[in-house]
Amino acid sequence: MSLDPSRRAFMAAAGAVAVGAVIPARAAADNAIDYRTAGDLLKALASGRVASRELVDSAIARIEALDSIINAVVVRDFDGARAAAAAADAMLARGDRQSLLGLPITVKESFNVAGLPTSMGEPKFKDRRPTADTLAVERLKAAGAVILGKTNLPLGARDWQSFNEVYGTTNNPWDLARTPGGSSGGSAAALAAGYVSLELGADIGGSLRCPAHFCGVFSHKTSLDLIPYRGSGPLPMPIPLRGDLAVIGPMARSAADLALELSVLAGPDPLTEGVGYKLVLPPPRHARLTDFRVLVLDKHPLCPTAASVTGALNGLSEKLEKLGCRISRDHPKLPDLAQTARTYRQLLAASYVADLPSETIEQMNARAKTLSPDDQSYSAAVVRGLTISHADWIRQSRARVGLRARWLDLFHDIDVVLCPPMPTVAFPHDHSPQFGRHLDIDGVNVPYNDQSIWAGIAILVGLPATTMPIGKSPEGLPIGVQIIGGYLEDRSTIAFAELIESEFGGFTPPPL
């Protein structure tokens, strides 16, 4: 779509939006460019219908008007963004056409942007300013993206909420009393609020998928090691730490934009595997929705899932079935979900041990001694993971390899698995100590950390998982679906999401 004169007039006047307003009138959002896709904006930039500086100024005006309420963009580099936009406009005028040239974006605070602070919400790191970019940020900049700033996260990126002592609390644009999710919560909130069209997040326990589900946007948890994890955090490693669970992934408001950003980010690190390997991802398995073989999972043996979430999932599966998709609700090759969850939880907890205070480890060791061997609860798996020996870690890793083989075997018969991203919709802010929190899931009191059960499937075995919005709860809160595919078949899950989006719709703006 072209940017007509009235649209240009809006952008020119964007700075006049009342910063002091609690929330601008809905009409302002509807009349703005803020909810266009990255693809549309890039076409407008390439054709000369809009300048990068105009897009940057419009985004800054919207952030300044709304973010005192939402608190998503907690590190700002507006002067740097304006300078980068001017440089991008000069390049566009010369005919340069990098894939993201002139597009304003934000990135999660944990990713290093040279000269900007990276604390991960930890007060002792609040003044730390890395001098080099995270490799993923370097790739975004090389593609021409203009970085406006960085978005909020929980302390250490270890929560399904986004608050910390350094930057405060990020609110969900759909309901300010609720969390946008975590750990990429500021990223999802920035997208939902219309600040930017692309974001960069990461995931080890649902950190891309939870916020996308809670805020009604799109995210893609990539296949393990698809995007190198080098240069992140206040104490970055000099070469990439080979992935065990955590991944980097794109976030957007459309499936096509996920594919666009992934094309920029994916590929081996030139310092390590890139010396000898190039990435060639397979194309999507199918071009038509009705050709996909779909397995739907709406129940987990270790944790309930809210009826509103399963209802939206089953509503989607019924629509797909009516279209002619081959829908299954069970499969003889489906790996044991309980074993998958317990193995994941132990390895996830083990990944945190090196960064825990010694007193916490001592408490966990004391608690582990009280566990019965028969206690196979999810909470017990956490304690065992936090006190795991190296020998037991190897045993759990062997179990993971066996589960990975079974999941990959399943994808010989199935193209995608659909399941909830999380057991609930966005919940009210809860800043009490994390290990004492609980969730109310349709009247059932559930330990807070159990909510990672659905997210853990794809993380444990390194599979791609795309999350997209598919409906609303009775309270009007977004509900998403998680689309899991075979290893390195990232294009298939994104393509399936794009087909669903085309057929049934996708992102809708919150009532700001």
Model-derived features: positions:
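Acyltransferase
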Residues: 54-57, 86-89, 307-332, 356-368, ...
